[in-house]
A protein has these predicted regions:
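Bacterial Sec-dependent N-terminal signal peptides
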Residues: 1-37
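N-terminal amphipathic/hydrophobic interface segments
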Residues: 33-236
Length: 236
């Protein structure tokens, strides 16, 4: 069906290996971590700067005596990314911070990341965003409750269920990643793609939000109003 092909093309074009790291604990909040794939070269370290806070104080209740407690219209900058929140703990010695409530990370006009909680490590350049998370990259939006964003790899990845939406399709899965630079996304476990013309279910799917091409790499079912197709390899 030509209308179907305009909406999405399904092909097999290469293999992808997905790696999940061992779960670990990090920071003052116990959150599950998934390490991204990185090149061997580590990022050059640069300083996280506090740009503004209505109130700055020390707190005896914080387990880190060097923590700066910030309240009201808090703003940080790290290289080209700006971070905003209602309150924060700034750990200047370790070049890291925790941000609470109304959290925003903005990088130019290409990337916006929102959530209720953020732990950001300026040395590794990894942001851990939790609860009501939304990543926006032009016409693509990724929503989840647990997302890590690796600034070096330019990769956002979720591991507790998520949804990616663009102009034509809605994709959901238990685990996934999205690259704002390449527009490529990878979905694993309980994958579902909903298009106005059909619904695709699979266990693994690759999807490019720029080209609207989906690559299936395993057993998949494609259902439309008048047909059902099962495919492991092939085109639709």
């Amino acid at each position: 069906n030509m209308n179907h092909r305009r909406k999405i093309k399904i092909c097999i074009n290469g293999r992808r290996v997905l790696l999940l790291s061992i779960l670990c604990l990090f920071g003052f909040c116990l959150v599950a971590q998934v390490q991204p794939r990185r090149n061997a070269t580590q990022p050059a370290k640069s300083k996280v700067y506090l740009l503004h806070a209505d109130v700055l104080k020390k707190s005896k209740d914080n387990p880190d005596p060097n923590a700066q407690i910030l309240v009201g219209d808090v703003e940080f900058r790290h290289d080209s990314i700006y971070m905003y929140c209602d309150s924060a703990c700034f750990y200047e010695k370790t070049n890291s911070l925790e941000a609470f409530n109304n959290v925003r990370m903005l990088q130019g006009d290409t990337l916006a990341l929102y959530g209720d909680y953020l732990f950001y490590d300026g040395n590794t350049q990894i942001a851990q965003v939790r609860n009501n998370v939304r990543m926006e990259n032009r016409t693509t939006t990724l929503t989840t409750d647990s997302l890590n964003y690796d600034r070096v790899a330019n990769l956002g990845y979720f591991f507790d269920g998520g949804t990616l939406m663009d102009e034509e399709n809605v994709l959901t899965s238990d685990w996934g990643e999205y690259s704002p630079a390449t527009k490529m996304s990878v979905f694993n476990y309980e994958v579902k793609l909903v298009n106005p013309q059909f619904t695709l279910t699979s266990d693994t799917l690759r999807y490019n939000t720029a080209t609207k091409i989906a690559s299936i790499v395993g057993p998949s079912d494609i259902d439309s109003e008048d047909s059902h197709i099962y495919s492991e390899l092939g085109f639709y």
